[in-house]
Structure formats: structure tokens, C-alpha cells
């Protein structure tokens, strides 16, 4: 499933062709994706200017001139591509390049610029939903989300408060979207490695008895910032080989320090450890037992 860097890459890829442009017409080529489309889905989009394209955690939000907001989620296999008027196709860069077959093109936005924006989703775990601008805070998919990890409010003190007293593992706490929004398995493994913290460590150890952030919390927040920013600059992570027609995006997997590197040497200078894998809460965890404590 796409994590924050992949969704942010999508947003940046779509922003130039969506923001300020009008959705002349929209097509929903089937009745549902993960959820059924609203009966008036196409009608509410037709003729609307996209005032802005934002992101909240792993969701995209298109702010429409009508006061509505188009909420979009990529699911497991969703991707956008932009077909320009001169028929040059460019990706709205989420890099699991499955499903370019047009049979999986389920939604198309025909923009006033002449470009078409196509949503392709072979597994149909993605969804689109129109809500009122005033409903964002109460929308079930958004209302319980924690702070953005790249936002100003996310710091060591905030993370310590969120984890104080928690008896769950540090990795499980970071994957809890109520604690921090947008992190997933890949970037949690990578951030914990860079902070030299064990995924098995109790989340409560990020806070002192008085609730103040420990050095562990400070290192972890810095590592989260670093990993996410590096991944965004690389266009996210692609776990399958592919090439994009507009350049090399989605190559952060070449910078993985532990993820998907089971049995390989640890990349920490001076560490003679080996990357291990174990299953934690139903997900693969990759770490170096020697330098992550």
C-alpha cells in the first residue's frame, strides 16, 4: 500500500495539471471501487474548478470551486496518469506500475487544459468520495488521524506525549495512524534503523516518567523527517522494476538500509551485524539486532 512519500509524489505529479483547471467532464466507468460511487458523483464534479490539491496522510483532497472536496485513496494498486493534449502520457507518479491495461482505467477527468487524468486500479481497493468542505473534520477516514510527520506540530515532545504509558511496541505505535499519520511498514523500518532503535522496544520509553521526550524520541523524530524527505525527493519506493516515460522516479528502494534486506550485512559503519526479518503484528519487520536497541 502507498505510504506518505508515494502519495505526496502523486500529489506533486498531478498538481500542475489539476490546480486552477476545470473538470469539464468526468467518467466513472464502473459502479464501484472499494466502495460504490455516490449516485451524483459525476454530476458534482462536472464544471468544477480545482482550487487546490492537498494531501492528508495517505489521502488526496481536491478542493473544488463548489465548496465540495474530492477525497481520493490509491488503495493497493491505484495509480494516476496524465494524458496531455499532444497524447504524451506522463505518470502522476505512484510507482507500483501494475495495471496500465485500459480495462482497469476506472475514472477519467477531462480537464479544461485538454489533458485527461486517468485513475487505474486493477485490484479496486482505492476509492473516491465527494464530501463538503465543512465535513473534513468529521469524515470517518480522516477524523481520527494523528499529526502529519512533516508538519510543524510533529516533534519529539508530541511523540513522547502520544507514546507515554503505551505498552505496545515502538513499531506498532508508529504504524498507528492515530499517533502519526501516513507512516507505513517501509518507512517505519527505515526510520527505526536510522534512529538505532529496536522495533520491539516499548513505545513508552520515548517519554520520561514526567512525560518529557527522551533522547530516543528526539533521534526518532529526526530519523522520520530524514527518511520521508529523502523518499519524496526520490519519488517514493517502487518494489518492481519499471521505467517512467518522463524520468527516473520511484527509486528510494535503492536507498533501503534494512527493508527487504534480510540476510545482508548491516550498513552502519563498524557494525558487523546482519539484517534480520521477523513477523510483527502480521507484517514483516526488518532490523539489525546488533545496532538497534
UniProtKB/Swiss-Prot annotation:
UniProt xrefs under Pfam families: Fapy_DNA_glyco (PF01149), H2TH (PF06831), zf-FPG_IleRS (PF06827)
Needed co-factor(s): Zn(2+)
Any Gene Ontology biological process: base-excision repair
Zn finger (FPG-type) location: 257-293
Gene3D superfamilies named in the record: 1.10.8.50, MutM-like, N-terminal (3.20.190.10)
Origin superkingdom: Bacteria
Protein family (similarity comment): Belongs to the FPG family.
Protein name, entry field: Formamidopyrimidine-DNA glycosylase
Organism field: Bradyrhizobium sp. (strain ORS 278)
Amino acid at each position: 500500500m502507498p505510504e506518505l512519500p508515494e502519495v505526496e509524489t502523486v500529489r506533486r505529479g498531478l498538481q500542475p495539471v489539476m490546480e486552477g483547471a476545470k473538470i469539464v467532464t468526468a467518467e466513472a466507468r464502473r459502479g464501484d471501487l472499494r466502495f460504490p460511487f455516490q449516485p451524483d458523483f459525476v454530476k458534482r464534479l462536472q464544471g468544477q474548478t480545482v482550487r487546490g490539491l492537498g494531501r492528508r496522510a495517505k489521502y488526496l483532497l481536491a478542493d473544488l470551486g463548489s465548496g465540495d472536496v474530492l477525497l481520493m485513496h490509491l488503495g493497493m494498486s491505484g495509480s494516476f496518469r496524465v494524458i496531455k493534449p499532444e497524447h504524451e502520457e506522463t505518470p502522476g507518479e505512484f510507482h507500483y506500475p501494475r495495471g496500465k491495461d485500459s480495462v482497469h482505467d476506472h475514472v477519467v477527468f477531462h480537464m479544461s487544459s485538454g489533458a485527461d487524468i486517468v485513475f487505474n486500479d486493477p485490484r479496486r481497493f482505492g476509492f473516491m468520495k465527494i464530501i463538503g468542505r465543512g465535513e473534513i473534520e468529521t469524515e470517518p477516514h480522516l477524523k481520527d488521524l494523528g499529526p502529519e510527520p512533516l508538519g510543524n506540530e510533529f516533534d519529539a515532545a508530541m511523540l513522547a506525549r502520544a507514546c507515554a504509558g503505551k505498552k505496545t511496541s515502538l513499531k506498532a505505535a508508529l504504524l498507528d495512524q492515530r499517533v502519526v499519520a501516513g507512516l507505513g511498514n517501509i518507512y517505519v523500518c527505515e526510520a527505526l534503523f536510522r534512529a538505532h532503535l529496536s522495533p520491539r522496544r516499548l513505545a513508552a520509553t520515548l517519554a520520561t516518567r514526567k512525560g518529557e521526550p527522551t533522547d530516543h524520541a528526539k533521534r526518532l523524530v529526526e530519523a522520520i523527517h530524514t527518511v520521508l524527505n529523502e523518499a519524496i525527493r526520490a519519488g517514493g519506493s517502487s518494489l518492481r522494476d519499471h521505467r517512467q516515460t518522463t524520468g527516473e522516479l520511484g527509486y528510494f528502494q535503492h536507498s533501503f538500509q534494512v527493508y527487504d534486506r534480510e540476510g545482508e550485512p548491516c550498513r552502519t559503519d563498524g557494525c558487523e551485524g546482519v539484517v534480520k526479518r521477523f513477523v510483527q503484528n502480521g507484517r514483516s519487520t526488518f532490523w539489525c539486532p546488533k545496532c538497534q536497541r
